[in-house]
A protein has these predicted regions:
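Active-site microenvironment for binding and transforming phosphate-containing groups
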Residues: 1-196
Length: 196
């Protein structure tokens, strides 16, 4: 587990598939989580209790100690804190292009800090013209020289504060789950909460 600040946790493959493994959740000390059924869209919903909160790609709350979680395997997991609120976002390229980050910023209000977890980095995030056209200011190259997108840069451009980015590529690192590398359904968790 990577815990860069109070109220923020990013799991690794060693922690297990957090989407399915409730015992692994308990090892984190946060057994009850508020979650959403992720759809690669822009919706961010408010949560006041644990459980499923429908189709969305982000959650926000002011409830102290309520763990909000999204699950990723190459997409960005983003945690925003500010003014007694927290938002957790599943930010894939479709969601970033659709405005999920801006919607989360709106839900938090006065954003004080942002953490971006392990995700597919430009070294491995090869994209075609339909994706690159949406991220013109954030293009890069893969290790093999093909066009890629720096999604963390695209997210950072939509934030009111400079994010702390965990600079670990899910596809390159065997200690992370990666849909592009493995094609499995295993997922990392991004968890955020308002500390007590």
């Amino acid at each position: 587990m990577i815990a860069p600040a109070d109220g923020v946790a990013f799991t690794t493959a060693a922690d297990g598939d957090m989407r399915r493994n409730h015992q692994a959740r308990q090892r984190l000390g946060l057994a009850e989580w508020a979650t959403v059924r992720q759809v690669h869209g822009s919706a961010v919903v408010d949560a006041s209790a644990s459980g499923d909160h429908g189709e969305a790609d982000g959650l926000a709350t002011s409830a102290t100690g309520l763990a909000l979680a999204v699950f990723t395997a190459d997409c960005l997991g983003v945690v925003m804190h500010g003014a007694g609120r927290v938002a957790v976002v599943h930010a894939g390229w479709r969601g970033v292009a659709a405005g999920v980050v801006a919607n989360a910023v709106e839900r938090v209000g006065d954003v004080a800090s942002v953490h971006i977890g392990p995700h597919i980095r430009p070294c491995c995030f090869e994209v075609g013209p339909e994706v690159s056209a949406r991220f013109v200011g954030h293009l890069s190259r893969t290790r093999t020289g093909t066009t890629s997108v720096d999604l963390a840069s695209a997210v950072a451009a939509q934030l009111p504060v400079e994010p702390e980015i965990i600079d670990r590529c899910t596809r390159c690192g065997n200690d992370m789950f990666s849909h592009r590398r493995n094609g499995t359904g295993e997922r990392l968790a991004t968890v955020g909460w308002v500390p007590s």
